[in-house]
């Protein structure tokens, strides 16, 4: 239905980064070792971790130097969580406080580090495990209990932090072509 394609386009419609945002974003990526060049990062980050990401991968941590996780690598940009219910509940719960505070504090082995994470979180999911609940052309094969279990993978407090919920129905190719 184009949910992922839509999410990938969001950074292109956001305002240009300020110089301070460029510096801050570049610093985070430098610490993480993810800079692809020597100059400033001038475009808003778009991070899309796989649903198997660990809580440490999402929030940050590690041994030795406390490294930023995906929430901080997306700072001043977009963190896209595709197939939201497929992420572990433990990993998703890491997001609650950073979304609220705009920063994340990581404590590991007596060390404490705070990274900024002013992020737009965008998530996509199907209405049920098979993906066809409510589809006018295909029959959903999920039981009511299976759908409920699927939707309950996401906690209410996390859902409360999403300001906008949009249903994106499948559109036939012919309808797109004719518009």
Residue spans for each PLM region:
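Short gly/ser/thr-rich secondary-structure transition/capping motifs
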Residues: 59-65, 102-107, 145-149
């Amino acid at each position: 239905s184009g949910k992922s394609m839509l999410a990938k386009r969001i950074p292109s419609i956001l305002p240009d980064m300020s110089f301070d945002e460029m510096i801050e974003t570049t610093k985070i990526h430098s610490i993480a070792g993810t800079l692809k060049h020597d100059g400033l990062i001038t475009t808003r980050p778009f991070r899309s971790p796989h649903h198997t990401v660990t809580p440490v991968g999402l929030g940050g941590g590690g041994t030795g130097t406390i490294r930023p996780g995906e929430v901080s690598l997306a700072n001043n940009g977009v963190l896209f969580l595709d197939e939201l219910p497929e992420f572990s509940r433990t990993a998703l719960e890491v997001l609650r406080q950073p979304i609220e505070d705009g920063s994340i504090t990581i404590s590991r082995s007596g060390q404490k580090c705070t990274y900024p994470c002013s992020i737009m979180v965008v998530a996509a999911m199907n209405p049920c495990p098979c993906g066809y609940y409510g589809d006018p052309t295909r029959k959903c094969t999920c039981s009511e209990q299976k759908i409920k279990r699927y939707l309950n993978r996401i906690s209410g407090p996390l859902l409360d932090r999403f300001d906008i919920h949009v249903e994106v129905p499948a559109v036939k190719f012919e309808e797109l072509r004719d518009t």
